[in-house]
Amino acid sequence: SVTAAPQEDEIPRADGDDAAATDTSALIWYRYGDEPMLAAERRTVSRLPNEPYETALLRLLLEGPSLDAPALRGLFPAGTRVISTSRQGEMLFVTLSYQLMNGYSDEPSNWRSDTAWAQEVPLRRRLAMQAIAATVTENTTAQQVVILLEQRGETTDSLRLRQKYYTLNAADDALADPLRRDESLLLTASGTMRTILTCIQQRDIRRLYRYLAQSDPDTGEARMEYEAFASKWTEYPALTAFDFSGGSASGTRAVFTVSGTRLADGVSQKFTCLLYTSPSPRDGATSR
């Protein structure tokens, strides 16, 4: 469902070590399928006595999405742990275990020579860090996140994460920049609408299909098979330009006013219509 970000006075605070154990609700950002995007799942964050809220929040992120969200995927190598978190004003310092630098279990050894994997491997690392930034900024007042890395006997002048995490170049020892929220990677209500309209404009039918609901939320009718969907799509006019506004949330949907031009039988036509997105980890980020 579309869920508004928490207001500042609703954000749990855990700056002291004497905080009591508590359960709170939070939006945790995970990868949406194989897409280069993140989608949020609302989860219950169980905080242990004296555990900072930010630590519990990121622990849940690293564990991966729940079984109720089959469309979402975790982003961190096996064994990666949150060792500690510390707030300094609007900056959150996060220390992660050394496993962060490990490869993923499904990465082929020759990934650099494979065109698809050569794009996928760096993308995973970028999305993993953005998942941290998005989850932290969504649920706390922190604006930036600095990642520190557990050291295992190495001699170094800083615990800061290095650029080689992103570039996968062992010689790239420059310090990584603090993480900031990047809305272009997030399937918020507006982000989902923009992605879907872009798919329509580019006639990327296979990708568009991944953003359709598994079933109609109003009627319960199941999504048609891809072959039928792709065949039917050839009947529709081409979308040549679009813009949208609104995004007011109501219940389980966010409604947008979409305008633009479409090309039908060689004739350009202007149009305006209402569309809505209904991001749901059960069905994926969806649109009608």
Range-by-range predicted roles:
Residues 1-282, 288:
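Bimodal "functional hotspot" detector
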